[in-house]
Curated annotation (Swiss-Prot):
Keyword flag tRNA-binding: yes
Organism: Syntrophomonas wolfei subsp. wolfei (strain DSM 2245B / Goettingen)
Catalytic activity of the protein: tRNA(Ala) + L-alanine + ATP = L-alanyl-tRNA(Ala) + AMP + diphosphate
UniProt record similarity statement: Belongs to the class-II aminoacyl-tRNA synthetase family.
Gene Ontology cellular-component terms listed: cytosol
Main localization (coarse): cytoplasm
E.C. number(s) listed in UniProt: 6.1.1.7
GO annotation, biological process: alanyl-tRNA aminoacylation
InterPro entries noted in UniProt: aa-tRNA-synth_II/BPL/LPL (IPR045864), Ala-tRNA-lgiase_IIc (IPR002318), Ala-tRNA-ligase_IIc_anticod-bd (IPR018162), Ala-tRNA-synth_IIc_core (IPR018165), Ala-tRNA-synth_IIc_N (IPR018164), Ala-tRNA_ligase (IPR050058), Ala_tRNA_ligase_euk/bac (IPR023033), DHHA1_dom (IPR003156)
Protein name as it appears in the record: Alanine--tRNA ligase
């Protein structure tokens, strides 16, 4: 029997033997692609190659790509576990041709691999083609010998692929496996393209990228057609391992067995096994996403991870697990996948810790959600209402991760109803906002359009590592998206020159600013960006600039130097963080500009003042040691052998630039730096905080900015010391003494308030009366705060013993009621929820709650006496 590891290895070796370069799976976090939330197909990392924006040394490639489909346009989250095939995380095996081979070879490779290498029976294989693709219809029988009766023509929806509204596109051909009539849905017309039953299992999709579609929809043949194929490893494994579901393969069974151990329950097929399948799938997705740098948060990718993780926890609770458990599955996931993805093993402990902390956070969140739900119901009672608004239920779900079914249960327990239509409305509004926010495809279309118009313009040459000024030729002027011959005074334009010292925004470093000067005008450069091979200078024209004229380019030297100080400082900071906190404290993002630096890194808790002090001291010591800073351009593999760190979220070519700070630090980096650490002068941390679960941020300044900051701190310290009649060095002790004095005063005030409260309680107790050995206290009080009202009522109930206590208070125009019934009176039929509901109804409101404790609200404060009288009447009747 084939193992999944053998299938993956055999696939890659098969294509490598046929001239394909084996390319590592790219990260699940797409690099420089705003159209994607997660990598969801093997072709994602080759998108720029297909678009002609990037070139590789190879024209044939093969890969086993990590993919996630959860969130965004491609979202299988709610289907996971309900079907045998859908997953949040999966692997896509693929082979690609960039203008090399085409349909004949792609069909031949696919057929040979399936029938001869892994041995699938030919008679079990079916093929779909695009309805107008006669070429594929002829090639399939010729190459494979397949019976034309097993070739099905389908329309554009099923068998035509495109990258977007415009750009590369083409027909596709899918290979399906017939699992047999016993798996049929039983419909008379059951067949490929008619139904989605489990008889017809889609295995491999071959995309024939042969056209370019323009804005009018017209398609013209590509000069060099390409191939993009994808086959799910999980699906092929299920066939070759002879099991009915992907979840029964060796990719999932060890995880499911671990869940059985954790729950003490046996896995079953069908509906009973649904929670096991969800947890197994989500364990894989969480492990791989965290390994690729995604951390739980409230937006973007982190929000999707949080949803996946919390969904798994909910199903764990369904299986009877109350505490943290999901992190215990990570070891099993790593054991299954470590050979193909060694990064999992390297980050195993970090992945477990992130998941464990998020689990604990969610358990607290559930408690917070319970409190919030109580507050929502209390506000409804104050309004005289017993409906939980849909938008508030959605807030519980979205902000607190509070499952809707728990909100529904709470509503039922408290005799409330839930506005489900309002909840659905809020959910749809959020989806609309997400769709509005995802403008990446528009951006990609604009870049593609601009690239097409610049096709005849020579690439820009960056000279800014060596120079801060240069002489060049103005190659192009762009206004809007049109090429212009001239740029006039006041116009906002983009300039492209043959040579430029201006650094384009990249890798967290902001663009250079400065001036591009021509014979009759100039451009004050406000921003610089890179588009493929061109460097674009953005700004507003003063005078007139003309295409083809000679221009002088001059950077703002002080700003460039300040930026260089901060960029080199981030490298020193990165090293110090890993020294003090551990190797897991790796860069997750940065901002480098003249006035400051910002550095994001992975760490699971706030830094102590001692840790911050050590980090700051280490950076300053590296500065004062006057380390030389050198750069080397070398092959990516050679750079890794040199020990250079590759940073998360960066896209590297085959040649990379290594920035070395003596033996202290070595990183792949394209930014600008000082020549010697002494040029940084001084480093000062100004802030540290959380920007998401497991993600911290340090803000800092260097050079003259750091010196000015320290002077400001000193001035403020002197002012504070003067105000408190102290010296700066004795200020902390003076503040401590003042705090101690304030605490003593607070205690005195608290004692006075408690004595006052006891006095008020004693007065109320005297108003209680007895009926059949039960104390009854139903009174109006002057306590506006609902929490205090509830606290006082409970205290009075405890003081009276066998009692029913109901208090009412007025706030504004509304009335609040709270009622407590001692447990020994519940058997006599007293029900707090019914009592407050009756009283609230008299006051024009509503509410209810549990038999032992309930709250309600009324709209008419003038009816408070009648409401209390109604409550007394009801209690007397019940006890009599």
């Amino acid at each position: 029997m084939w193992s999944s590891a053998e299938i993956r290895k055999t696939f890659l070796e098969y294509f490598e033997e046929r001239g394909h370069s084996v390319v590592e799976s790219s990260s699940l976090v797409p690099v420089n692609d705003p159209t994607l939330l997660f990598t969801n197909a093997g072709m994602n990392q080759f998108k720029d190659v297909f678009l002609g924006l990037d070139k590789r040394k190879y024209v044939r490639a093969t890969s086993s790509q990590k993919c996630v489909r959860a969130g965004g346009k491609h979202n299988d989250l709610d289907t996971v576990g309900r079907t045998p095939r859908h997953h949040t995380f999966f692997e896509m095996l693929g082979n690609f041709s960039f203008g090399d081979y085409f349909k004949r070879e792609a069909i031949g490779y696919a057929w040979e691999f399936l029938t001869e290498v892994v041995g699938l029976p030919e008679e079990k294989l079916w093929v779909t083609i695009y309805q107008d693709d006669d070429e594929a219809a002829d090639l399939w029988p010729e190459i494979s010998g397949i019976d034309p009766g097993r070739i099905v023509r389908l329309g554009e929806k099923d068998n035509f692929w495109s990258m977007g509204d415009t750009g590369p596109c083409g027909p596709c051909s899918e290979i399906l496996y017939d699992r047999g009539i016993e798996y049929s849905c039983g419909a008379p017309d059951c067949g490929i393209g008619v139904c989605d039953c489990d008889r017809w299992l889609e295995i491999w999709n071959l995309v024939f990228m042969q056209f370019n579609r323009d804005e009018s929809g017209e398609m013209t043949p590509l000069p060099r057609p390409s191939i993009d194929t994808g086959m799910g490893l999980e699906r092929l494994s299920s066939i070759l391992q002879g099991v009915d579901s992907n979840f029964d393969t060796d990719l999932f069974i060890p995880i499911i067995k671990r869940i059985e151990e954790l729950t003490g329950k046996a896995y079953e097929q069908g509906e009973r096994g649904f929670p096991f399948r969800v947890i197994a799938d989500h364990s894989r997705a969480c492990s791989f996403l965290i390994a690729d740098g995604v951390l739980p948060s409230n937006d973007g990718r982190g929000y999707v991870l949080r949803r996946i993780l919390r969904r798994a926890l909910r199903f764990g609770r369904f299986l009877g697990i109350e505490g943290s458990f999901l992190y215990k599955n990570v070891d099993v996931v790593c054991d299954i996948m470590q050979e193909a993805y060694p990064e999992l093993l390297e980050k195993q402990d970090f992945i477990k810790e992130v998941i464990r902390l998020e689990e604990e956070r969610f358990l607290l969140t559930l408690n917070d959600g319970l409190k919030k739900a109580e507050e929502i119901m209390e506000r409804a009672r104050q309004r005289g209402d017993n409906v939980i608004p849909g938008e508030e239920a959605f807030m519980l779900y979205d902000t607190y991760g509070f499952p809707l079914d728990l909100t529904e249960d709470m509503a039922e327990e408290n005799q409330f109803t839930l506005d489900k239509a309002g909840f659905d409305r809020s959910m749809e509004e959020q989806r609309q906002r997400a769709r509005q926010a995802n403008k990446g495809e528009d951006l990609l279309g604009q870049e593609r359009l601009l690239s097409e118009k610049l096709a005849g313009i020579a690439p820009s040459s960056f000279t800014g590592y060596e120079n801060s000024r240069d002489e060049s030729v103005l190659l192009a002027i762009i206004k809007g998206s049109e090429l212009m011959d001239k740029a006039l005074n006041g116009e906002e334009v983009i300039l492209i020159t043959a040579r430029t010292p201006f650094y384009a925004e990249s890798g967290g470093q902001v663009a250079d600013c400065g001036i591009i000067k021509g014979q009759e005008g100039l451009l004050r450069v406000q921003d610089v960006k890179k588009l493929s091979a061109w460097i674009l200078h953005y700004g507003i024209v003063e005078g007139v600039l003309t295409t083809g004229e000679g221009v002088s380019l001059q950077l703002d030297d002080p700003a460039r130097m300040d930026t260089a100080r901060n960029h080199t400082a981030t490298h020193l900071l990165h090293r110090a963080l890993r020294e003090v906190l551990g190797e897991h404290a790796q860069q997750k993002g940065s901002l480098v500009e003249p006035a400051r630096l910002r550095f994001d890194f992975s760490h699971l808790k706030a830094l102590s003042s001692e840790e911050l002090s050590r980090i700051e001291q280490m950076v300053n010591e590296a500065i004062w040691k006057l380390y030389p800073v050198t750069t080397t351009v070398t092959a990516l593999g050679q750079a890794r052998e040199m020990g250079a760190m590759a940073l998360f979220g960066e896209k590297y070519g085959e040649e990379v630039r290594v920035v070395q700070v003596d033996t202290y630090s070595s990183e792949l980096c394209g930014g600008t730096h000082v020549q010697n650490t002494g040029q940084i002068g001084l480093f000062k941390i100004t802030g540290e905080g959380s920007i998401g679960s497991g993600l911290r941020r340090i803000e800092a300044i260097t050079g003259s900015y750091a010196l000015e900051y320290i002077k400001q701190l000193e001035d403020e310290l002197k002012k504070a010391a003067s105000a408190l009649r102290s010296s700066p060095l004795e200020l902390a002790k003076r503040i401590e003494n003042l705090n101690n004095s304030l605490k003593e005063k607070d205690k005195e005030i608290e004692n006075l308030l408690q004595r006052l409260s006891r006095s008020s309680s004693d007065e109320l107790v005297n108003k209680a009366f007895q009926l059949n050995d039960a104390w009854i206290l139903i009174e109006e009080v002057d306590i506006e705060d609902p929490g205090s009202l509830r606290q006082n009522a409970e205290m009075l109930k405890d003081k009276l013993g066998r009692a029913i206590v109901m208090l009412a208070s007025i706030k504004g125009e509304k009335v609040s009621f709270v009622c407590f019934v001692s447990k020994d009176l519940l058997e006599q039929g007293l029900h707090a929820g019914k009592i407050v509901a009756a009283a609230a109804q008299v006051a024009g409101g509503g509410g209810g709650g549990r038999p032992d404790m309930a709250q309600a609200g009324g709209r008419d404060k003038s009816k408070i006496s009648e409401a209390l009288a109604e409550a007394r009447k009801m209690v007397k009747k019940t006890l009599s």
